[in-house]
Regions:
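N-terminal secretory signal peptides and thylakoid transit peptides that target proteins
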Residues: 2-16
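C-terminal segment of N-terminal export signals and the immediately downstream linker at the start
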Residues: 23-45, 49
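N-terminal targeting/tethering segments
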Residues: 43-63
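Non-catalytic, conformational "gating/processing" segments within enzyme and secreted inhibitor domains
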Residues: 57, 96-268, 273-274, 284-375
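Short phosphate-coordinating micro-motif centered on Lys-Gly-acidic
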Residues: 70
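Alpha-helical support elements that line or immediately flank enzyme active sites
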Residues: 73-77
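Primarily short, surface-exposed interaction patches in extracytoplasmic proteins
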Residues: 87-90
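C-terminal soluble interaction/assembly domains
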Residues: 348, 354-410
Length: 410
């Protein structure tokens, strides 16, 4: 096949999490059909991918859910070896697309933030070369399962205009936080399809950190260097666990459906060992050890992280190879051209600060009312060294965001 017969498409995803202040864990609801396997697979994929990215220096932040959704729409049109590799990479169950539909609808339900106390939305779109022979059944699958919008664009005649249109859509879906997802040169006259996912989350903590309690204090980097950063402080009742290697704290947002879980190694240089050892099973086991503690003294840095990734090499290292060269995406189209993925692009942003709603400040569970009850043993969770954090949907169990903070000032 000549080079002129080879065409490409892009898979892109964008994620934003903006958060503020502190509360209590919401018990997970029984998973709908297909949720459990899909969610476990998404978590496993996210940690596999994180394992490839963790060798990069500095802070990290990504949305495993966003990347999995974008690749899921792509896999829906894959066949043969390409489909086998993508299914294995994504840990997809047999009913993955239908299960994704259930999860996406659950995440987007009651979109009014006044009803559930936070804003969470996920949006998918398929940007197709107009006039190209796309299969109607493929379009129906991605619209039904992934709630994707379909847009006809003209990559052939106006690739830069198409890129601008897609980037504008991403900006709108992420409330102007993710800009220029597709960089110059990523869309060309050879592009035939771009698949995008955007996920946006903004939540207030159940009970706020008071700004007057935030102080500039030392944060110890992995090499022992100390930097002054704003450390927020609050004492209250939280889900907490610890072992010899790390401490775990769960910090739910207003509405209690979404929470941030922080995994804090005991030592400033202990993060690489925790990262290397973390699997979906071990993460689940750690979460199951969380117990309410009546008095937890929490120090947490105020921070922002923005990261961009071109995921071609990490995905190929995990076994998704044929999708980038010699792919079989015949489930998408009836054209005679060879379609390969040219790039998988992901961009994510997180903002953590003190802000919150004072209306729901009662967060603890008081056990025992007799005068002889022993006083609670105070716990101290001082995140003044590198740590892992993830933002989870407690209803479906989905890991929406996953990150690492090594330096709040970076």
């Amino acid at each position: 096949m000549s080079q002129l017969d080879r065409r490409n498409f892009l898979t892109a995803s964008a994620a934003l999490a903006a958060s503020a202040s502190l509360g209590r864990f919401a018990p997970a609801q029984p998973a709908a059909a297909g949720w459990a396997q899909l969610v476990a697979g998404n978590t496993a994929f996210g940690l596999d991918l994180y394992g490839q990215l963790r060798t990069e220096a500095g802070n990290l932040f990504l949305s495993p859910f966003s990347i999995s959704a974008a690749l899921g729409m792509t896999a829906a049109g894959a066949r043969g070896k390409t489909l086998e590799e993508m299914t294995r990479l994504l840990h997809f169950p047999a009913d993955a697309h239908a299960a994704f539909g259930n999860v996406i609808r659950s995440l987007n339900e009651e979109a009014d933030p006044k009803k559930r106390g936070f804003t969470l939305s996920t949006a998918n779109a398929l940007w197709a070369q107009k006039g190209y022979p796309w299969r109607a059944e493929y379009k129906k699958l991605v619209t039904d399962a992934y709630s994707a919008d379909l847009f006809d664009v003209d990559f052939l005649s106006a690739p830069e205009e198409a890129r601008g249109t897609i980037n504008t859509w991403v900006m709108k879906e992420t409330r102007d936080k993710i800009k220029d997802l597709l960089p110059p040169g990523s869309v060309t006259r050879d592009t035939r399809l771009v698949l995008t996912n955007a996920i946006y989350f903004k939540g207030d903590w159940q009970a706020p950190f008071e700004k007057k309690a935030t102080k500039d204090l030392p944060f110890t980097l992995a090499d022992g260097t100390k930097v002054e950063v704003p450390l927020m402080y609050r004492v209250g009742s939280y889900l907490y666990a610890e072992n010899d290697a790390f401490q775990v704290l769960d910090l739910p947002y207003t509405g209690r459906r979404i929470s941030m879980t922080v995994i804090l190694p005991r030592k400033p240089d202990g993060l690489p060992a925790v990262e290397k050892d973390l699997t979906g099973g071990k993460l689940d086991a750690a979460l199951k050890t969380l117990r309410y503690e009546r008095e937890v003294h929490v120090h947490l840095p105020r921070f922002k992280v923005e990261k961009s990734f071109r995921l071609n090499e990490p995905l190929q290292a995990l076994g998704m190879k044929s999708a980038f060269a010699g792919a079989d995406f015949s489930g998408m189209h009836t054209g005679g051209e060879q379609l390969d993925i040219s790039a998988v692009i992901h961009k994510a942003f997180v903002d953590v600060n003190e802000e919150g709603t004072e209306a729901a400040a009662a967060t603890g569970v008081v056990v025992g009312t007799t005068s002889v009850a022993p006083p609670p043993m105070p716990r101290y969770f001082r995140a003044d060294r590198p740590f892992l954090f993830l933002i989870r949907d407690n209803t479906t169990g989905s890991v929406l965001f996953l990150g690492r903070l090594t330096n709040p000032k970076a």
